[in-house]
Amino acid sequence: MKLHEYQGKELLRRFGVNVQEGKVAYTPDEVRDIAREYGQPVVVKAQVHVGGRGKAGGVKFSPTPDKAYENGQNILGMDIKGLTVKKVLVTKAVDIDAGTEYYVGMIVDRNVQSYTLMASAEGGMEIEEVAAATPEKIIKYRVDPITGLRPFEAREVALQAGFKGNLNKIADMMVKMSEAALKMDAVLVEINPLFVDESGTPLALDTKFEIDDNAMYRHKDLAEWRELEAEHPLEIEASKYGFAYVKLDGNVGVLGNGAGIVMTSLDVVNRAGAKPANFLDIGGGARADIVYNAVKLVSKDPDVKSIFVNIFGGITRADEVAKGIIQALNEGILTKPVRMRVAGTAEEEAKALLAEVNSPLIQMYPDMFQAAEAAAQEANKVEAK
């Protein structure tokens, strides 16, 4: 279950994280009233379950209550990537120049069956862009789900990432974020930016928080927070299949097994000159029917012009992946070019199955870089028409 920014901040606040003060508004009048109450410049932020709100005009600085009213009028009812803005978060503005922005996040990595902590001094940017341009600037650290993130580990990660300021305070916030992720069964928690002021005090300015749908029975008090109409239809469908799926802005569908492999796949697609249209982790040990459903899901996205499949077979058999893709092809569901790299268990069997089909839509490559390059070329070729 995806949470809105204000909901994610509320959960983090419950775990002791210092978050930016703000209130939710549903009308321009409410936006103005909140701005007047705060008595200082505010930021009006669209609350929708997609990224890129700022680029779409859904985040506006408002120096006065009247400007806040105007911005509220413009943002409420706005369409952002197919979702209508029905509410906004009005927060006290922060002077970004009077401090430093960082990034911290926790994600479930199915490959290592654990959480991975990520930290970067490149805060305020989309982490996918940082990963694509300068992956060395993202520090990753495996977090034991039994012990959680310990203070000395958090300090070491902050130091490696190049964080400045009071590292003890920053580490304390990272530990509390880790506690929130573990206790709330989150599959993703991000604080971006994590703002550190001149005194060294950290403040969470923006958040992403997503809870595992399979664990919602443990968090029945949050059930009323879910707004299906506020979620992308493909993400709703993905949750029914049990997929870890996130809709993105690009034109290349991405399908892989394990969060680490999928994150890497996003990076190589960016480097190849295209943009990923989604994050889709089919998990470990996926059978042909699971792969079939994954291909069907990605194929429904009109933004997808080609599909990049990146599988490293361990408990996931490559021939099962091939069977699922072939079934989608035979049923006429797969109509977009698939460029894939499959390695590991039953790799040769997969190659034999695909060679027998001999479809120009499906091509295999010896490594993920070549496959991603081919997928990017196919997608960009369609876009250029």
Curated annotation (Swiss-Prot):
EC identifiers of the protein: 6.2.1.5
Residue ranges of every copy of the ATP-grasp domain listed in the record: 9-237
Binding site for Mg(2+): 192, 206
Cited InterPro entries: ATP-grasp (IPR011761), ATP-grasp_succ-CoA_synth-type (IPR013650), ATP_grasp_subdomain_1 (IPR013815), Succ-CoA_synthase_bsu_CS (IPR017866), SUCC_ACL_C (IPR005811), Succ_CoA_ligase-like_bsu (IPR005809), Succinyl-CoA_synth-like (IPR016102)
Any one GO molecular-function label of the UniProt entry: succinate-CoA ligase (GDP-forming) activity
GO biological process: succinyl-CoA metabolic process; tricarboxylic acid cycle
Pathway given in the UniProt record: Carbohydrate metabolism; tricarboxylic acid cycle; succinate from succinyl-CoA (ligase route): step 1/1
Residue sites binding ATP per the record: 45, 52-54, 94, 101
Cofactor(s) named in the record: Mg(2+)
Assigned keywords, A-Z: ATP-binding, Ligase, Magnesium, Metal-binding, Nucleotide-binding, Tricarboxylic acid cycle
Catalytically driven reaction(s): succinate + ATP + CoA = succinyl-CoA + ADP + phosphate; GTP + succinate + CoA = succinyl-CoA + GDP + phosphate
Binding site for substrate: 257, 314-316
PANTHER family xrefs: SUCCINATE--COA LIGASE [GDP-FORMING] SUBUNIT BETA, MITOCHONDRIAL (PTHR11815:SF10), SUCCINYL-COA SYNTHETASE BETA CHAIN (PTHR11815)
Quaternary assembly: Heterotetramer of two alpha and two beta subunits.
UniProt-recorded name of the protein: Succinate--CoA ligase [ADP-forming] subunit beta
